Amino acid sequence: MGAEFLVGRSGSGKTKLIINSIQDELRRAPFGKPIIFLVPDQMTFLMEYELAKTPDMGGMIRAQVFSFSRLAWRVLQHTGGMSRPFLTSTGVQMLLRKLIEEHKQEFKVYQKASDKSGFTAQVERMLTEFKRYCLEPEDIRRMAESGTASEYRGERVLSEKLHDLSILYQQMEKSLADQYLHSEDYLTLLAEHIPLAEDIKGAHIYVDGFYQFTPQEFRVLEQLMVHAEHITFSLTADKPSYEREPHELELFRMTGKTYYRLHQKAKELNLDITYKELSGTERHTKTPELAHLEAQYEARPAIPYAEKQEALTVMQAANRRAELEGIAREIHALVREKGYRYKDVAILARQPEDYKDMVKEVFADYEIPYFIDGKASMLNHPLIEFIRSSLDVLKGNWRYEAVFRCVKTELLFPLNEPKAKVREQVDQLENYCIAYGIKGDRWTKGDRFQYRRFVSLDDDFAQTDQEIEMENMLNDTRDWIVPPLFQLQKRMKKAKTVQEKAEALYRYLEETDVPLKLDQERQRAEDDGRIIEAQQHQQAWDAVIQLLEEFVEMMGDDEISLDLFQQMIEAGAESLTFSLIPPALDQVFVGNMDLSRMYGTSCTFVLGANDGVLPARPDENGVLSDDDREWLKTIGVELSSGGRERLLDEHFLIYMAFSSPSDRLYVSYPIADAEGKTLLPSMIVKRLEELFPHHKERLLTNEPEQVSDEEQLMYVVNKSVAQSFTASQLRLWTREYDISDVWWSTYNVLMSEQDRLQSKKLFSSLFFRNEVKQLERSVSRQLYGERIQGSVSRMETFNACPFSHFASHGLHLKERQFFKLEAPDIGQLFHSSLKLISDRLREQKLDWRDLTKEQCELFSYDAVERLAPKLQKEILLSSNRHYYVKEKLQKIVTRVSGILSEHAKASGFVPIGLELGFGGKGPLPPLTFQLKNGCTMELVGRIDRVDKAESSKGLLLRIVDYKSSDKGLDLAEVYYGLALQMLTYLDLSITHSADWLGMRATPAGVLYFHIHDPMIQSNLPLGLDEIEQEIFKKFKMKGLLLGDQEVVRLMDTTLQEGRSNIINAGLKKDGSLRSDSAAVGEKEFDLLTKHVRRTFQEAGEQITDGRVSIEPYKMKNKTPCTYCAFKSVCQFDESLEENEYRPLKAEKDKTILEWIKKEADGNEHS
């Protein structure tokens, strides 16, 4: 029995020596005793490939490459150690989730933390660490109870942590005893079964690529030393460490410590020990500067490198994106100009998660094949999401979010249906469910989904053919979504045990054809060359089956709730990872500086060399803190390295990365993150400057104009990248900056290609201005027709912003509807409630002034009850919260009807029209305009309320409009066409009064009635009558009145002098109007109505002529963009030269009337 220790610095040729030795052995005796090459998991593929490509051998039987886990499987298969099933990390996490729920009341520290996401995984990692370091549950319990830990900082926190962990550890071992094996037990079993393994006896074993070993692994190595014929240990170190452990500040502390322990064990076993120390740097024979870096990295003081050097490049970038794109360009240059293959290039990062997603995006753009080393989570795979969301549907009472998470995995889609069509149907159904608030038994009960595009609270319309077609499609889509999930729900309710629930879930997957659908996706991915994706589909299905099998194996007969079942499935799913091998040989390797292993790398890029990243700051996200670990170490408990030791080992990891390439090393760092926050360079960059004082940093930039013309050529990598950078350079040229001739040449090449449509579209965007051209008359006619029928509010929308009108009425764009009660819905309810009360009064031959308080309450209650089922898809009946809202609305309607009754008692005006229609089937004709361009425009709508009164002037009419917001009539808004409704309604009523009422009427005014439930604030105590009086004042109507005292007295018969409590007017002692009254003369009313008509005429002509410009107004701080639904469509941006608000000047009513009079005079003379 013998042991050889092979020692040398990085690049000295240790691995190559081992491979040569194995190859020589294979040539000498192809069928001799076994040769075992033991390496880390990440290195097995590389070493197998290196041995397999030996030119003069057609294959190998004698030599095999193993990791510890693969060696364990091999030995245990041959020696009978596989009698009990192994539980993977996934199975252990599911078991732990169950144990946590069962024992959380016994915890001292982790009662609350145990419910948090990720806790199960942290505990599993901790218990795995205990196993790796050969600590039994009893050891942990003893430490918790001994009081030793409690001395730590005078607190019992560590003791209580160990108490909680010992409970879970003990219960886990109890659950596994004699039935299953923890995934970490394989090494313990391996050590026990090596004496029985014939393959080990007489074997030659080579151990390479490791920096350190766990106690479990040391036990295995001890048995290998005892039973193998010869074992060779290869370790990266500057000298043998057989007399003492190295000092903790030495660069090779980690490997030196490992060397010492292995050497001591070999001595204990009386092995024949030989030593081989490799000096020199075989890897860097052609690159003396890299040899200098390897030799001097840890030297203090450093010896500067005086010669010319090209093998090292330090690069600074503005951000990570610029850094990665610069590296992609450099890789292209290495492959294109220097003759390298992609497989010769490696990219290493200390925090690869900062770059992972960006690597995929950038390398796809630059057409660089790559392989990202490491295991990716399966959580985002459609199958895992399908299972999780399906269980969420059952647990969450069929919330639409969970249902559509499930459906959008596309694993529920009908087999062999066109996916594009099904996706469209699913989107339509999702919009419907969001708008109608579909959840719970509304999915599963037999009632069909009812679809109505337009719903009125006042009228019932028959369904249109389009609505019927949509309704049928929605129900057909629902009919293939619900049955499988509903069947799963029924089976889960019936299932009691874990096995029954697992069977229900598996049957659900089978019945929805998930295996077949995944196989189709796998085949599609293979056909398209997406090899990794194809592997992932197969691995995901295998992982789910294994998860369910382990679940049933562990606790198949246990009765658990659906909630706990889901938690355990979630815990298991969170631990599932893809394990992939490189799908091709010629790829750039992207790895982790800590875990990845490389061999034969020519060029290495080290990314993200920033302060706090390289060397990395240790994190303390584990169950035990660094202080906990340090304390346990002082009492002889060995665990994995704490933060302090990990920080000491960082320089070794950096050294290994820097010495990994044979030809070129690139070190880069960004100076800002994605949010623009400053990032500082690492101390390593400073160290490189000391070692190479003549070296100049390069700048990696995505702005070619910052580098020379020759360097700008590097940006022309391929067509898509060239298009992007050419566009950015031409954009500078449009701003009158000089650009290199490189880009004009590139532009000419791109535009001369046969396939130049994409380039043409891209470059045309350089001259884009966020403007909309006026529609051609023919297009306008196709959109609107020769005869426009619209509403007053539509004209107001046009005057506010022509593009908003075009989006809503030309393109018919609509916002997604949500199942929630909004202000327009409440306003609609108030209007319709007051109409119903008015209709009931008319039926009972009552007047508003006759209403009692009890009648107000009864009528209001009945009105809201009748309307609630029609309002916003029955939202007021959908929940207890909305029932409460309904009661509040009933109280408001009661309050309002009481105020209207009081107003009626104090008024000479009486209602003669409620919800009075004009146009269509209404009693009044539409407001019609013959436009100059030959089109006709009709305005139709409804007037909330028209009141009449008899006076010495004859018949008076006024308009009352119900508003759920406090509003008055702003004549500036009237002038600019933003508030046209009230004067239009008055105009129509007056114009057609002779035909409608039998006599010509005079305008009395327009008033807004604010529907609300006011709160009264007072510094003094008030009696009930005083409170009612204050509330009454809050309902004062605002608007514009005819400036006549008789009219004012008719509107408020209680008014003698002073301000009215009913209208915004008042009388002086002599009976004349107060100056603060909102009143004008009859002539001014005539001017205003004529101005409104002119405004309609102009708007109609502009609409039909095709005006669609992006021109929102701005008056004071008010702009229609604030609540516009189409901001994302027009993309109005005030910072753009062509986008400016249309300024409207706010003036007093007197000034506005003067403007209108001047315009009217001008029109008369023209």
From Swiss-Prot:
Result after altering R70A: No longer recognizes the Chi sequence nor generates the Chi fragment
- A Pfam match is PDDEXK_1
Task: Outline the subunit composition.
Answer: Heterodimer of AddA and AddB.
Principal EC category: hydrolase
Source species, please?
Answer: Bacillus subtilis (strain 168)
Effect noted on mutating D961A: Loss of 5'-3' nuclease activity, helicase and DNA-binding are unaltered
- Ranges for domain UvrD-like helicase ATP-binding come to 1-278
Q: What is this protein called?
A: ATP-dependent helicase/deoxyribonuclease subunit B
